Amino acid sequence: AIKKGVQNELLDEKLLQFDLARLGAALKPERDLQFDYLGLQTLYDRYFLHVRKTRIELPQAFFMRVAMGLALNEIDREARAIEFYEVLSTFDFMSSTPTLFNSGTLRSQLSSCYLTTVPDDLDGIYESIKENALLSKFAGGLGNDWTRVRALGSHIKGTNGESQGVVPFLKVVNDTAVAVNQGGKRKGAVCTYLESWHLDIEEFLELRKNTGDDRRRTHDMNTANWIPDLFMRRVMEKGEWTLFSPSSVPDLHDLFGADFERAYVAYEEKAKRGEIKPSKTVPATDMWRKMLSMLFE
């Protein structure tokens, strides 16, 4: 399987430097019996290497290939590979899916998740979407922080126009995750994050609804809303909550705790005096109800 994988440019040719006879002797074919039908079918469908849809691995060879990739840079690589194989093949430990997919391959991307912050400029936004596509291609899960991107109605100096906010870009992110699945083995996985004071938060909370304009819906993408303690106190006090565009409050996203609360309250006072636009004040309890209701959509 190793030689065939290298010949078909699926595996790193450095794997041929291992003592393959020693590793082959360490295989325990009887451990295949630990799998039930569903487990074997999942390995066959998603994990085994194949050449034009013909699988070139069996379960124990698969585990050894993963172990070899992990031991590639070890001093006594055969001994370490056998150790890794032992814990994998006995199910004492199981690596993450990207490691199982990619260990020992030409692109040994072994990490499960990548977290990024999207900048507030067009080049940066589309560079982030491109990075999403490339990471998803090799089975990386994605978490994107979109809080820095200016909200709907914010001024764009370069064009003297107004921003369309984060939602149209999130539709592109959603469709990119669908188009660039994880090596053809499973759906792309992406979650976008927004803070509760962002002016687009109300529409953001509705992204996964089954009703409304489908051009402003992201049915295949997860969403996450960061909630500060101050917001929850406003909910309990039945107070108001002010929404801002991050372009008007550029430092707010970097603050937390008491520093965040001081800055947020100061920005609220400025908004009341008309010194910050656009902004919006909503009842905190209404926002809280919307957050809760979207958990069940």
Predicted regions located by residue number:
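Extended catalytic cores of very large enzyme megasubunits
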Residues: 1-297
